Amino acid sequence: MSRVGKKPVTVPAGVTATVDGQNVKIKGAKGELSFRVPDLVEVSHADGAISVQPRSQTKEARAMWGLSRAQVANLIEGVTKGFEKKLEINGVGYRAAVAGKVLKLSLGYSHDVEYEIPAGITITTPRPVEIIVAGIDKQRVGQIAAEIREYRGPEPYKGKGVKYSDEFIFRKEGKKK
């Protein structure tokens, strides 16, 4: 039984939630998000809370139960607080800068890497070695942060590259003579 799915998601003041069949629409101060709940679970909205129940007790339905409840909770958190991922750049000459709707990364290649910032996402660089990806959709924020990190992932010898700010890089020892 899903321990996550059992708890109903409370809808805070200032947030409107509408459930139309399998579609959940959440509207808040930061924007509007929607999610289609899988057919294996049913969703209901009552008394200022959204609850999710499995239609059957199959393993697949129980898995979708917890997933759907977590997705709805993420929608509510996204339209109220938003999400952000912080990235750090380590390496001599490695830097980032935002120019209009483009993130320019100097990562040791013969050319600068240009990443076009998608709509609904804000990318800021408080310092040349720090990138903050923010938005209301948790999945998109994480995906974009992963795409930026992928341009030059951290290497294990000197730790050069782009890494998440809370990520620990296991260091390897170099060759011994």
UniProtKB/Swiss-Prot annotation:
Cross-referenced Pfam families: Ribosomal_L6
- UniProt-recorded Gene Ontology molecular function terms: rRNA binding; structural constituent of ribosome
Gene Ontology BP, a term? cytoplasmic translation
For this record, an example GO cellular component is: cytosolic large ribosomal subunit
State the InterPro entries in the record.
Ribosomal_uL6-like, Ribosomal_uL6-like_a/b-dom_sf, Ribosomal_uL6_a/b-dom, Ribosomal_uL6_bac-type, Ribosomal_uL6_CS
Query: Can the keyword Ribonucleoprotein be found in this entry's annotation?
Result: yes
Q: Which UniProt keywords apply?
A: Ribonucleoprotein, Ribosomal protein, RNA-binding, rRNA-binding
| Family affiliation | Belongs to the universal ribosomal protein uL6 family.
Whom does it interact with, and what assembly results? Part of the 50S ribosomal subunit.
Q: What does this protein do?
A: This protein binds to the 23S rRNA, and is important in its secondary structure. It is located near the subunit interface in the base of the L7/L12 stalk, and near the tRNA binding site of the peptidyltransferase center.
Protein name, please? Large ribosomal subunit protein uL6
Q: Which organism is it from?
A: Methylobacterium sp. (strain 4-46)
**By which gene is this protein encoded?**
rplF
